[in-house]
Amino acid sequence: SNITDIDDKIIEAANESNIPISELTKKYTDIYNADMSYLNVLPPDIQPKATEYVEDMINFIDKLIQKDKAYEKDGHVFFHVPSHEGYGKLSNREIDQQLAGSRVQVSDIKKNQQDFVLWKPSSKSQPGWDSPWGIGRPGWHTECCVMSEVNLKIPFDIHGGGQDLLFPHHENEIAQSCASVNSDLSLIHI
């Protein structure tokens, strides 16, 4: 299991609670691990945190840009969804049947409204890392994909996650993995 310890919702929740992001993520990581222990689930051999892999994420994103699977615009880097022929296969969603603006705000800087963010600029009040595209932070889908790619042999056997993550999260992980290593992220998705 990996730990997302930086994303927009975490930044917002930490600001609303007036506590450091690290304190908030530690609290929920501890709760998660306690719940898993209560259920008699063995602890993972490794439990990577997204912030420990930002350099890997920057290299991963740069690789996707070099392969013409992603593009930069105004400090944002987007994955170009039409570049992945199998997009929508896991969730049984046709690209041309998706309604622009139904899930995320319509953006005039995207080539295609289904394109998703790999890197986004950070304001002075938000955490950020130096990158070829400016100070910013990785997108959530990229965090999970890169931590998996660094720590596991791709494709790994089983990828699990909540039904609520099927689209767009798992679909976007698959698209990035296929673009990066020409392989699905895992053999089985549950």
Would you name each region that the model predicts?
Residues 1-40:
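N-terminal, positively charged nucleic-acid-binding surface of large information/translation enzymes
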Residues 3-7, 29-32, 42-57, 75-84:
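Short, glycine/charge-rich beta-strand/loop segments that flank catalytic centers
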Residues 17, 21-25, 46-53, 166:
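Short secondary-structure transition/capping motifs
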Residues 34, 55-189:
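Alpha-helical recognition segments enriched in aromatics with Gly/Pro capping
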Residues 41-42, 159:
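Short glycine-enriched loop/turn motifs at secondary-structure junctions
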